[in-house]
Design a protein with these regions (language model features):
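Positively charged n-region of N-terminal signal peptides that target proteins for export
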Residues: 1-12
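Short linear motifs at secondary-structure transitions and domain/linker junctions
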Residues: 8-9, 65-71, 230-233
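C-terminal motif of bacterial Sec signal peptides marking the signal peptidase cleavage site
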Residues: 17-20
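Bacterial signal peptide processing site
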Residues: 22-24
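Mature, soluble, non-transmembrane domains
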Residues: 85-259
Length: 259
């Protein structure tokens, strides 16, 4: 069930409640935590106009939304773990029984499973990836390298938010992603991992940097070849994302592959 028709404060419910890792997590930014059993814990950090809302009013709204969802989807599908309002900042921590509950309640696409299962579900992994070393540095990796390890776990999300997983990150997609720890990433539009490596598919001897157009006279067909010899530089820190509105929507899928 996707919640809609939200104004002002209700953005906290509809635009995505961001996750933290476990009920004991204290996060200062929107974060989504995916546990090893597929349960989701979220922390949403929201700046409020205190002239409109206070802690009691906010709690009543959240409790009502949760009760409505659970009535339709089963008891304890979604639970409020903690809610505080201090100095104009609201922190809302919630528990979701399943990934599907998180997606249905927030309208934010989220997937968790093995790579082979994600492929069967229709995710194509058609993007640039980077390998994450023990020290947090990144290296080049191909899509084929990743798909060959189909039993690895993957979290796929379509949102601008921080994400933590219960495991060690091995690979991440490059667009809009910054690796912040062995088990965490930050997703913000305008940031990302700059691809400074060339994959095997892109490698071309220097004498062949430019391919000539070949024509086949008999068939009348023209075959054109194009070689990618570089990539555009990412804008990196030039773009700053305002997190005060919660997890904002995006058209980009972020892939986090781990064990």
């Amino acid at each position: 069930m996707k919640r809609s028709g939200c104004v002002g404060l209700t953005i906290m419910i509809c635009a995505g409640m961001l996750a933290g890792c476990g009920s004991s997590l204290e996060a200062d930014t929107n974060t989504v935590y995916v546990s090893k059993h597929g349960k989701i814990v979220t922390m949403d950090v929201e700046q409020l106009d205190q002239s409109y809302y206070d802690e009691t009013e906010l709690k009543e709204f959240v409790d009502s939304a949760v009760e409505e969802y659970n009535t339709e989807n089963g008891k304890n599908s979604v639970k409020v773990d903690d809610l505080t309002v201090e100095d104009g900042t609201a922190k809302l921590r919630m528990d979701y029984e399943t990934v599907d509950d998180y997606t249905a309640f927030n309208g934010v696409e989220l997937y968790e499973g093995k790579i082979v299962q994600a492929l069967a579900a229709g995710y194509d992994f058609d993007t640039d990836f980077a390998g994450v070393d023990k020290d947090g540095s990144v290296t080049g990796v191909t899509r084929g390298d990743i798909l060959a390890q189909e039993d690895l776990k993957v979290v796929i999300i379509k949102a601008n938010t921080d994400v933590k997983i219960d495991g060690k990150i091995l690979y991440v997609s490059c667009d809009n992603v910054t690796v912040t720890g062995k088990d965490s990433v930050s997703i913000k539009e305008g940031t990302g991992i700059e691809k400074t490596w060339i994959t095997e598919a892109e490698e071309v001897p220097s004498t062949e940097a430019v391919l000539e157009t070949e024509s086949t006279e008999d068939a009348g067909d023209v075959i054109e070849g194009e070689v990618i010899i570089g990539t555009e530089e990412a804008s990196g820190n030039d773009v700053v994302t305002n997190l005060s509105g919660g997890s904002s929507g995006t058209d980009v899928y972020t892939y986090i592959i781990y064990k």
